[in-house]
Amino acid sequence: MRRKNSDLKDSTTASHAAAWRQQLHSRLKEGVLIALGALCLYLWMALLTYDSADPSWSHSSQVDQVQNAAGRLGAVSADILFMTLGYFAYLFPLLLGIKTWQVFRRRNLPWEWNTWLFSWRLVGLIFLILAGSALAYIHFHASGHMPASASAGGAIGQSLGRVAVDALNVQGSTLVFFALFLFGLTVFADLSWFKVMDVTGKITLDFFELIQNAFNRWMGARAERKQLVAQLREVDERVAEVVAPSVPDRREQSKAKERLLEREEALAKHMSEREKRPPPKIDPPPSPKAPEPSKRVLKEKQAPLFVDTAVEGTLPPLSLLDPAEVKQKSYSPESLEAMSRLLEIKLKEFGVEVSVDSVHPGPVITRFEIQPAAGVKVSRISNLAKDLARSLAVISVRVVEVIPGKTTVGIEIPNEDRQMVRFSEVLSSPEYDEHKSTVPLALGHDIGGRPIITDLAKMPHLLVAGTTGSGKSVGVNAMLLSILFKSTPSEARLIMIDPKMLELSIYEGIPHLLCPVVTDMKEAANALRWSVAEMERRYRLMAAMGVRNLAGFNRKVKDAEEAGTPLTDPLFRRESPDDEPPQLSTLPTIVVVVDEFADMMMIVGKKVEELIARIAQKARAAGIHLILATQRPSVDVITGLIKANIPTRIAFQVSSKIDSRTILDQGGAEQLLGHGDMLYLPPGTGLPIRVHGAFVSDDEVHRVVEAWKLRGAPDYIEDILAGVDEGGGGGGSFDGGDGSGEGSEDDPLYDEAVRFVTESRRASISAVQRKLKIGYNRAARMIEAMEMAGVVTPMNTNGSREVIAPAPVRD
């Protein structure tokens, strides 16, 4: 028991001793820091009050009274620092004080001696002293406040500066010593320049915010003063009414009555004008009921129920899409009128006199059309967009400066409860059903809830841009499904280029594809070259037929088939008198979709820009259209050449006005709400239309793709991805020939090529080229020799051949 008590007593004594030592160590540390701080102040005082007449280290003096505030020791210390460091002597106490303050801030942390860290701090201090003194010697001259024999950099700076200037000149020496100075400051003071920039930026922003808040408070106080003055005047008038009868002076009493009558007349006039002023015209809010279905929807509802297989050549039903949700009741006319009055009040607080003329509520935003007072510039209202958003407590406010056919200015304010626009709503509308184009694009609803259906053939190309998460990919899916619900593979074909390998790969296997979804950027360039070659081939074909566009060509072919006299290919080259030209068939519209052409331009280079520009310039009449999408709307991606040839653009939400101007040549996209909210710039106009994009889920896309796969397999043209000469035809002359003069029936590989073609039933030049590992020109001559020998048929209008000869019998 005694042993336990003694052990407990010893442990208690040890703990008390440890605590006492820790407390003593903390107090000693504080004392040392106080002493160092006092030393810094003492040196600073000695330097500031230095007098060259005082006795010092560099010279003697007979003066009895020392002028230096730090005394004789201070005069000697200042003289030594000036003679050694020059002007840098002023910074030496400051650096010592900074390090003292840094240690003082960590006084409560456990202190451990670190030789490595102390050595680096000492190296940093040495670099600071050497570089600072040298810079002072190079760029400054000694003043009368310093010793007569001292230079601006002291003895250290003078020695280093002379050597450095002789070797590196003034500019080079400055660069080297400045870098050493910054390095020394970083190591000695543990300073991060990135943190310095962050702190500086934050201080600057806080300063400007402080000024802005002070200005807003001043404006608010000014408005309150004006309101208070008006109230005081009204009180004075009321008091005058009561006091006036008791005034003995008849003359003053009559003047008071006259002033009162004038005020009453002015008040009555103002009230009558306010009552006569009509309330703002409020459009009826979008009906919560479902819109009237189109004829196609009604027809699909009456379709037979026991049809298990999809019929080839038919369109998938719209029932594959998710049904539209029931709309909730939106704002009442009273709330919209109150909102319009609030908007007038807020603008008046900012010094802009307006009146709300009409209100147009929509599913996502509400547009207030305001009539500015005489002399009010629209730019003043546009500059108040962010202030209005703050004062109205909304995400963003977009100002429409010009409304065609009206003198009003539009202010678009987001609704509190945003309604989702389902894709089935847009496709079920009569506008989509009655659209005659084979490549319609269902974008969504406008601000009033009406469906927006555009024609890609009239655009004829489209540029889509927006930041990540703005709804760009969903918008591209909606455009593709618009085409798939309207056109069969004989009417529209697709070439999809997907550098990200995620967005468009879901469409792999649908019969509309001319080639597999392209994910290799080299093959993407080949696909664009094939498109250029197909464009040239179609132009030659239409020129020979005497038509001006693809619609005229297809109409002429159909009329000839109905008349029983089908047309033949005018570009067919007869190899023998027995050869018959193939019959012409209608040509489909080709849509080239590039999901992220910024990545394609980065990998392939400027050649892609030239191919895109060439297609955009000439491919409209040939029925080839581009849809280019990117999430990086910068000038090196959306170049002037591309913008000049693609006037139709869609901008989703972007991060800055610069990006909006890059896409639309005007601002506005930075004020969108995201999630499919877009600005659509139609061809031939400079005024964008705000559209709320329709939402398409991944499940809906999968259902539509599976429905098309049941209706047929894709008929790929393999030559598309092999590389085609732009001057060739649709089956084109591809690059990569080996220059061999062989290729006829005398070619040693001809028999092997025939065996491969007849066994695989693929009469493709690129397939022979890959199988035999030969150049394109040699493989092309082999295929031509097979055509002359009757092994394969001549080239069809779509660039493919059929194998006639049977496969050889193997032993």
UniProtKB/Swiss-Prot annotation:
Q: Which domain of life is it from?
A: Bacteria
**Which key words tag this protein in UniProt?**
ATP-binding, Cell cycle, Cell division, Cell inner membrane, Cell membrane, Chromosome partition, DNA-binding, Membrane, Nucleotide-binding, Transmembrane, Transmembrane helix
Topology relative to the lipid bilayer, per the entry, is: Multi-pass membrane protein
The membrane spanning regions, by residue number, are 31-53, 73-95, 116-138, 148-165, 172-194
Q: Which Pfam families match?
A: FtsK_4TM, FtsK_alpha, FtsK_gamma, FtsK_SpoIIIE
This protein's assembly is summarised as: Homohexamer. Forms a ring that surrounds DNA.
User: Protein name, please?
Assistant: DNA translocase FtsK
